[in-house]
Amino acid sequence: MPFMFETILSRVKWTANTLVARLTTLYEYEYPRTAKEETGIDKEYHIKLWDEDIGAMLVSMMRLAGYSEQSQKTHRIFFKEQVARSLGLYPTTYPHQSAWESFMTDDHTPVEMSWSWSGNTPTPVVRYAAEPISWHAGTASDPLNSEATTECLASTAPLAPSLDLRWYRHFLKHLVADDSDGQHDTTDHLSQEFIAFDLDKDSMTVKYYFLPTLKSLACGKTNLELMEESILSLPEADEAVRSSLKVLTTYIRAYPQDEQPQAEIFAVDCVNPANSRLKIYVRSRKTTFDSMLEMMTLGGQTPDLTRDAIDSLRELWCACFALPNNPSVTSKPLRSKEHRTGGLLYYFELRPGAALPTSKVYLPVRHYGKTDDQIARGLSSYLYKRGQCLEGGLSYYEGVRRICKHRSLKQGLGFQTYITCAVKKGVVSVNAYFNPETCQYSRG
């Protein structure tokens, strides 16, 4: 009875806070879009399915990471009341076909989850990203899915005390296409906006992702050119940001045209610009360990990695891809994989006051690993050696086995999507990303 009362009270408080926050946020930031009232869809049915599937996985990940029961309830309520409500139609047939195919994951599931071990922290932070999808996205009434993101973003205010949308508003104008930009004939994806949440004890930090391909096509420019112009027009783009951007763009453009890494995604933290980051994501088709080090240091322009850091990165590389950890492995490319998301993904972070970018690499284990079982065992061993695990000393492998409830880890590849690594002060930080595979595997 006390638990039920507490849950009801939490929902009442959440609803009240959300109503106030939406009105305040929408007024303060003058959102240009309004949501249409749709009929003919049993929305509550689809919301319930999203919550029972991904909401339950989110709680499992939080519990395994050591979050309190109150924290789990707080973030589960937000997911159900705000995020699940923003994911559109839940897939009920397999293979799933939808009018809107999200670029978030390879099977188009519009949510990706992660555990993040920062530096020497023993247990991870839980994070997730979502692409809000309107009920009629991809149809004539909402061809570019322009209606869902605004409401979801506004609803974050009660749990995001540091929310600041100045940079969001700036880049929304520069990087997102709308119907007025004309025809959008492309064989690539139509996704343009993702929202991400880093979960603290009783709050969260919001991040926003822009995929500017449609806007670039409309403007007749490359993604990199569009990102560059939008950053340089930013009022807070100080000399350090400009210098950092110049280092990055010069390095990328120095590649031969057919080998040039391609800019794909741009992201900001929705916090005070003085504390925010500008993140440019680029994909390279080169897949050797040596090429990874080359990209991470921008050809040696950023501070050199220490020998210990390089050894740690090589150990992680071999663990993720089931390769022998010896010197010869560094020059051998991973097996050939012709896929839209093949190759290695990097992000380069620009900050006010920082004259050089910092980097992170995303290892696409879903393409180059053997099975999810092999990947989980490899990363589990790597983390264990560094004193990193889940709550109560539970191994990463056992944690992944528990959250992947719809199939055996040995029976497929793709539940773990990326293993990322970044080096800060000589210490390697690792994140593991998961695709719930909702659009690929039946839960029935």
From Swiss-Prot:
Catalysed reaction equations from the record: L-tyrosine + dimethylallyl diphosphate = 4-O-dimethylallyl-L-tyrosine + diphosphate
EC number: 2.5.1.122
One BP annotation, GO: alkaloid metabolic process
Keyword Transferase attached: yes
MF terms in GO: transferase activity, transferring alkyl or aryl (other than methyl) groups
Protein name stated in the entry: 4-O-dimethylallyl-L-tyrosine synthase
Summary of the function given for this chain in its UniProt record: 4-O-dimethylallyl-L-tyrosine synthase; part of the gene cluster that mediates the biosynthesis of an unusual class of epipolythiodioxopiperazines (ETPs) lacking the reactive thiol group important for toxicity. Firstly, L-tyrosine is prenylated by tcpD, before undergoing condensation with L-glycine in a reaction catalyzed by the NRPS tcpP leading to the diketopiperazine (DKP) backbone. Afterwards the alpha-carbon of tyrosine is oxidized by the cytochrome P450 tcpC to form a hydroxyl group.
Subunit structure: Homodimer.
InterPro entries assigned to the protein according to its UniProt record, in alphabetical order: Aro_prenylTrfase, Aro_prenylTrfase_DMATS, DMATS-type_fun
Family stated for the protein in its record: Belongs to the tryptophan dimethylallyltransferase family.
Keywords assigned by UniProt, alphabetized: Transferase
Induction entry: Expression is positively regulated by the thioclapurine cluster-specific transcription factor tcpZ.
Top-rank taxon, per record: Eukaryota
